[in-house]
Curated annotation (Swiss-Prot):
SUPFAM superfamilies: GAF domain-like, Winged helix' DNA-binding domain. Induction: By heat shock. Belongs to the HrcA family. InterPro entries: GAF-like_dom_sf (IPR029016), HrcA (IPR002571), HrcA_C (IPR021153), WH-like_DNA-bd_sf (IPR036388), WH_DNA-bd_sf (IPR036390), WHTH_transcript_rep_HrcA_IDD (IPR023120). This is Heat-inducible transcription repressor HrcA. HAMAP family: HrcA. The gene is hrcA. Keywords: Repressor, Stress response, Transcription, Transcription regulation. GO terms for molecular function: DNA binding. Negative regulator of class I heat shock genes (grpE-dnaK-dnaJ and groELS operons). Prevents heat-shock induction of these operons.
Length: 325
């Protein structure tokens, strides 16, 4: 446990280090933060914080920088304060859904970019899991003689678009007939479905197309639960370039792999969660990930992540995510 004065000094060191990217000395602390104590007292308190492993000295500077443990203590205090705050929730996602004609993928793509522009960090948005949602309708639209667009409408009102190649050109009337058949059979995806398809179709090519349609639809819905939309990838590269060029490649490999999806899906809490450095992975000591949930409605929800260097503006990011519903 640290004293109130030590906490104030630690907060000042963290915030100055994040703002300026340089180790912080006692003289700088007094000048920037109007601390009403002597430089000797500040140095003594900093020595105590260093002994507790909250700050550390670099070889090239007489100042101190926050350790991972120091960042963790600082973040825990922020999270504790945030949990007691009442904020007006933003429903930007619902606006984006309407603007994108209820196409979830398009809305999430815009959402990831907007979050990145606001936070000035790289963002990831995980596609919601449709297990709690029910397919209401399937519409087929002929884009050209050999390409059909399948529009899947869920009970929540959300829409997914899937491109489907066709070996033969179907008329619009035939596609409407197939759409109605598939929609009517949505609740009957069982062992009798294949018999129904055989009875319904008028050619082997129709049978092949309908089976392909059903398999594609099921695979798309399953795969979408693992889809991740990234915004502002270059922001992470720029931030890491300033601190540690050698760390960029393993970090990019991590956030572009299934491991990041697994990490985000494992965080099921609706509360804001912060993982710092090695808490994420032993090879990722230079980044932090702040996660939260977003909602389209009470049942359809997914994960948001903001990724940046360990010297992140945590307060700004936490306040931003705390306002998202």
């Amino acid at each position: 446990m640290i004293t109130d004065r030590q906490l104030s000094i630690l907060n000042a060191i963290v915030e100055d280090y994040v703002d300026f990217g340089q180790p912080v000395g006692s003289k700088t602390l007094i000048e920037r933060h109007n601390l009403n104590v002597s430089p000797a007292t500040i140095r003594n308190e900093m020595k105590q914080l260093e002994d507790l492993n909250y700050i550390e000295k670099t070889h090239s500077s007489s100042g101190r920088s926050p350790s991972q443990l120091g960042f963790r203590y600082y973040v825990n205090r922020l999270l504790e304060q945030t949990s007691h705050q009442k904020t007006n929730k933003l429903r930007r996602l619902n606006q984006l859904l309407v603007e994108n004609q209820y196409d979830v993928s398009s809305a999430l793509t815009y959402f990831a970019d907007e979050l990145s522009n606001i936070s000035q960090y790289t963002t990831l948005v995980v596609h919601p899991n449709h297990k709690q949602d029910i397919i209401n309708n399937v519409h087929l639209i002929r884009a050209n003689p050999n390409l059909v667009i399948m529009v899947i409408v869920f009970s929540s009102g959300h829409v997914e678009h899937v491109h489907l190649a066709s070996d033969i050109p179907f008329s619009n009337d035939k596609l409407n007939t197939i759409s109605n058949f598939v929609t009517n059979k949505l609740t009957e995806f069982n062992q009798n479905l294949q018999d129904d398809i055989v009875s319904f179709v008028q050619s082997e090519q129709e049978e092949i197309f309908i089976n392909k349609l059903i398999n594609t639809m099921n695979n798309h819905i399953s795969n979408q639960s693992n889809s991740i939309y990234m915004g502002g990838k270059v922001k992470l590269i720029d931030a890491l370039n300033e601190s540690n060029v050698s760390s960029i490649q393993p970090i990019l490999q991590y956030i572009e792999s299934n491991r990041i999806a697994e990490l985000l899906q494992d965080i099921s809490s609706p509360n804001i969660n912060v993982k710092i450095g090695n808490e994420i992975d032993d090879s990722l000591s230079d980044i932090s990930i702040v996660t939260s949930q977003y909602h389209f409605d009470e049942t359809l929800k997914g994960q948001i992540a903001v990724i940046g260097p360990t010297a992140m503006h945590y307060q700004n990011v936490i306040q931003l995510l705390n306002r998202i519903w």
